[in-house]
Amino acid sequence: MTTTPKSEQDRVIIFDTTLRDGEQCPGATMTFEEKLNVARMLDDMGVDVIEAGYPFASDGDFEAVHEIAKRSKNSVICGLSRASHKDIDRCAEAIKPAERGRIHTFLSTSPVHMKYKLQMEAAQVYEMVISSVTRARNHTDDVEWSAEDATRTEFDFLCRCIEAAIKAGATTINLPDTVGYAVPEEYREMFRKVRETVPNSDKARFSVHCHNDLGMAVANSMAGVAGGARQIECTINGIGERAGNAALEELVMAMRVRQDKLPYWNNIETTMLTHASKTVSAATSFPVQYNKAIVGRNAFAHESGIHQDGMIKNAQTYEIMTPETVGVKGTSLVMGKHSGRAGLIHKLEELGYKLSRNQIEDVFVRFKALADRKKDVYDEDIEALVDEQLLHGQDQIKLNSLTVIAGTHGPQRATMKLDVDGQIRIEEAEGNGPVDAVFNCIKALVPHDAKLELYQVHAVTEGTDAQAEVSVRLSHEGRSMTARAADPDTLVASAKAYLGALNKIVAKRQRDVREAVPAVAAAG
């Protein structure tokens, strides 16, 4: 297959504003070190321009931009500034250490913004555009000017301001859909008409900046590129003001996957996209929605039996890109109530089981029954089903009864009765809290060296009568076993979950012994 040479005129500059517009998202504030870490990651993955912050906003923002400017190896480091000279001068000082720095200054141009926000006449705004860009150009050759709320600005006035900004020295013109109001066709046409109308439009690169208020930020961004823009302003995970910004990972992969319709290219290393998503999610404490395009937990996960069957036969049946291209190790066939026999058989083979047709049928029937009761069915659950079928028995350790004494004074005490292989054992133990006392009881009754890795509790439903669902994960000999249990009594649910994980460890150990016997015999 012949590869078409990349043309510079089809190159799209990726301008990441996660550290500025993204951090303006309520609750997404990052620490100084977190900003440096995110900036380093953006620099490494090939982002062309990093908008590192708004230096005039605070001393902390200034210091972050200044330090990022010092450390950047590849990216242009940009600072945001209002149209005032004080803002611009402060921004210039912040980006000074950068090998390549940019000042991004902006001013509102729409009637509603000029009247209510700026309380200025159009003539005053026009003069301020010239004044601010001129001031910025005195500090650096790389100046970006944004017409805030461009999509609601009168066209003739927008063109006048753009022409003046370019004449004053702006090298990039950004026309943002500030409130996410535009639709793709009109956004594309705006860029086409502006570039056609403004006489010196060829002297600057045009840029898109789209918000997601109507869910069209990515579509609008690509429409703007189709209209002649060659810079996209975006954020990791699409975080930003209100409903967010266009998501960098979606834009980059859209250009990569649909080269037939989007014949543009960029410098992003796509295998870092998932890592970037997780880094920003951790820094902002904003979880990524499971069904988020490209980087969501379910982006390459399949539960439907029909889909799993297709994926097993050929991944192209239900995936338009490979998970490896975005830094995911592989496709996940999620086992649940929608899974069919083909999916279960594939999972059993992955786990190393070789079962007869009758055994598979037995496991499948019990798997479907379990999937109807459980939201998530994990590998450990399937292993437990198989172990139960192969061992012709149920859990060897069962909870018979539990009594816990807890209060504000004195140690917490638990008394537990277990059925261990048909033998009743009773023990009492104390702990630093009732849950600790319960787990200490189990350790006394069934001595083991498994380590507790996870203990989580949440209410299954609302109200004071809600069942508590407890998850416990135990680590033993390099393998983790997870179990869940639900009960109106949180302590009973905790005991059941712990015992469930312990039973899986016992079953796994017995299975390992069975597998070792044929190997020894063969060696003999």
UniProtKB/Swiss-Prot annotation:
GO MF: 2-isopropylmalate synthase activity; acetyl-CoA C-acetyltransferase activity; manganese ion binding
GO cellular component labels: cytosol
Any single biological process term in GO: L-leucine biosynthetic process
EC number: 2.3.3.13
Residues holding Mn(2+): D21, H209, H211, N245
CDD domains referenced in this protein's UniProt entry, alphabetically: DRE_TIM_IPMS
Region (Regulatory domain): 398-524
Main location: cytoplasm
Domain Pyruvate carboxyltransferase positions: 12-274
Compartments it resides in: Cytoplasm
Keywords (A to Z) from UniProt: Amino-acid biosynthesis, Branched-chain amino acid biosynthesis, Cytoplasm, Leucine biosynthesis, Manganese, Metal-binding, Transferase
Coiled coil: none
Matching SMART domains: LeuA_dimer
Protein family according to the UniProt entry: Belongs to the alpha-IPM synthase/homocitrate synthase family. LeuA type 1 subfamily.
Function (record text): Catalyzes the condensation of the acetyl group of acetyl-CoA with 3-methyl-2-oxobutanoate (2-ketoisovalerate) to form 3-carboxy-3-hydroxy-4-methylpentanoate (2-isopropylmalate).
Record protein name field: 2-isopropylmalate synthase
Native organism: Rhodopseudomonas palustris (strain HaA2)
